Amino acid sequence: MTTLKQTPSQTVGPYFAYGLCPQQYGYDLKSLFTPTIAAPHADGEHVLLVGQVFDGDGNVVSDAMLEFTQVDGAGRFPASRDDVAKSGFTGFARVGTGTDAQHRFVVETVKPGRIAADEAPHINVTVMMRGILTHAFTRVYFDDEAAANAADPVLNLVPAERRATLVAKRDAQPGRPVVYRFDVRMQGPDETVFFDV
């Protein structure tokens, strides 16, 4: 019997635009997922999660792709397609940074609730981009959830001086949507904390 070797890894990209986010990039193909997690009729506090991905030299990455997974405002994942259709909440978004003139990701969602009593509201993020051999996992916590963040078991695994790299900053201005700013830094002194999952 022949023993086969594992297929070698290669950098993840630049297939994203055409294969995973075609509508966002203007291709005549339907995207399976969009940057919208919560439709306008979904329950909860509607917010925008906005940010950029920076490489190790501090340059904005124009061709990264990010995926976001979260619960709704009540701490629940959608249970079925019917649940998604009725609630307007998918729990998942995919967005490329090349779809915005400033190379930002902009996700329309609702602020997540708690999944469990000891977990702070958060959004799971997967980052894929050129130059990395596998995707990177991180989380977004919220700066206006200080008490919940202080008790979160996952956030408490991170050294205190690094936790700020996981916390989105709220920007609420009258008459405008609430925005949480969260930048992903792939390397360097302010590198975002990534999880080995």
From Swiss-Prot:
It comes from the Bacteria. This is Protocatechuate 3,4-dioxygenase alpha chain. Plays an essential role in the utilization of numerous aromatic and hydroaromatic compounds via the beta-ketoadipate pathway. GO terms for molecular function: ferric iron binding; protocatechuate 3,4-dioxygenase activity. InterPro entries: Intradiol_dOase_C, Intradiol_dOase_core, Intradiol_RC_Dioxygenase, Protocat_dOase_a. Its cofactor is Fe(3+). 3,4-dihydroxybenzoate binds at R130. It comes from Burkholderia cepacia. Pfam families: Dioxygenase_C (PF00775). It is an enzyme of class 1 (oxidoreductase). The keyword Oxidoreductase applies. One of its GO terms (biological process) is beta-ketoadipate pathway. The gene is pcaG. PANTHER family: DIOXYGENASE, PUTATIVE (AFU_ORTHOLOGUE AFUA_2G02910)-RELATED, PROTOCATECHUATE 3,4-DIOXYGENASE ALPHA CHAIN. The enzyme is an oligomer of 12 copies of the alpha and beta chains. Pathway: Aromatic compound metabolism; beta-ketoadipate pathway; 3-carboxy-cis,cis-muconate from 3,4-dihydroxybenzoate: step 1/1. It catalyses: 3,4-dihydroxybenzoate + O2 = 3-carboxy-cis,cis-muconate + 2 H(+). Its EC number is 1.13.11.3. Keywords: Aromatic hydrocarbons catabolism, Dioxygenase, Iron, Oxidoreductase. Binds Fe(3+) ion per subunit.
